[in-house]
Amino acid sequence: MTDSLSLAEARALVLDCQGLASRSTFGSGSAGTKKAIEHLGYVQIDTLSVVARAHIHTLWNRVAAFKAADIDTLQQRGAIFEHWAHALAFLPMRDYRFSLPMMQRIASGESHWYKKDPKQTRKVLQRIREEGPLTAKDFTDKKSSDTMWARSPSKRALETLFMEGELMIPRRKNFHKVYDLRERVLPEGVDASMPSQDELCRHLIVSNMRAHGLALSSEMAYLRKGLGARMAQTAANMVEEGVLQRIRVGDQEYYSTTENLNRLGQKQPSPKLRILSPFD
């Protein structure tokens, strides 16, 4: 039998699991910021700033006394790293291994934004190996055109090496990525074993349940290349195992967990208005 939730109950569950019931849910400062990113699974990075970048806004809404410098502190300590979730994001370093499948696909020849230029990537990699961490501005070659998305050969090589995992971002300088070799950035002891597809799907499902409270399998596989059918099958298997359960909200059936459903009614949402970023 499929249990059901009212729209109001579903909304309350999502707000609670998203950490929006209170600005003290995760604590404060860099420790609270780390806890928030680990709970949410990732926070999308915003390259544009009008009032504030979206990732700053997202964390400010959840972490008491949050400052943008808290992200810098965590990144330089190796507690979080940058890579691709459904978009460029800050991710918990504890989840590093779950980015390896995408890195492997790019390294095996799949294009992300640009077709790989092996000669250029070797040249860029050699400079960083010899000179240490560099930004794109440290390379003086020019882009091929003035169009919005045009990039210089070195910038394309940096992004390819970053997506492959050969380069990581130990810090940003005036929000420009600083690139360095993975072996000089990845903390010792981080699990770098390649997950199976089943492990990856289970990780994404557990992360979604923790951060959202309920979700469709299609939402959990959003922009995760090639995982749609496997995600649906893994979610169904987890229902059989008693890890997930099916929940109906209106005409739509979602997945949730007993633990999440037991949260209903335990906390009253804050009556304060929260203005959320469109990326949130």
What is the meaning of each model-derived region?
Residues L276-D280:
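Short, intrinsically disordered, charge-balanced linker/junction segments flanking boundaries
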Residues M1-R274:
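Long, low-complexity intrinsically disordered regions
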